[in-house]
Amino acid sequence: MKKYHFLNPKGVTAHNLLINGDFQVNQRGQSSYTCDGTKRVYGVDMWSFSKSNTFMKVTENGIETNAPISQMFNKLKSGMKYTVVCSVDNVVLTKSIVGGTYDTDTSQTIVYLTFNNVERILVTPNGTQTINYIDLFEGEVVYKHQKEDYAIALLRCQRWLYVLRGNGQQLPCDIINTGEGIFTIHLPTEMINKPTFVSNNEIIKFVSDGNNSKSYNSNMGVLQKFGKNMIRMSYPYLAYGIPNVIGMVYLENATFTFSCEPL
């Protein structure tokens, strides 16, 4: 038996419940992603792999096998029939199943799909298979796959994940007498929640209007404020006692990753 779990994001299209089902949006920009089994790893936008501390599993004859690829979402209905369509090496496979429920030990109820007796895909040693796309439809009607316009797909993904690459750009900043350098990042679309923040540890530089400068590791920032289409970042400028001044922050090669992806 193999067990697959597909989960559904907000802002779905008319029929396909999945975002980035053809894997074209890859804001992190890596060519490969590795899951060591200790935590959930996100790869291309909206898709993750995990074998540890999760109810999601792929099993064969009761034995857990490879890490499942999954997408989290919140509109699955228990008792409703769903149809998954998957194209592997351009061969289209379909399967319909009724949604069920799973009670966790924290008294949360998870709705999931269990696929029994699915098509088996044989991979020879050192061989590869290409998943062209995955669609999920409510009901038993299978719709023809429509590749989403990249710009639209990117905006839908950016509600959950936004990656800003500095690439030498500069932004206005405020350097205030409490000893902080503050600048605002404008988002291309509203994120679904206040995101977490990580960076690639590259150096950014604050320069005041008096040409005084201070460099910082980009990961030292604090997400100070989150608004409808903006994020305000704060860095410990350490110039205590100075009057409020206007300056510029040079992002250099820093990459800022803001994520609302489910854990």
Locations of regions flagged by a protein language model:
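Extracellular and organelle-lumenal recognition/adhesion modules and their flexible linkers in secreted
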Residues: 2-263
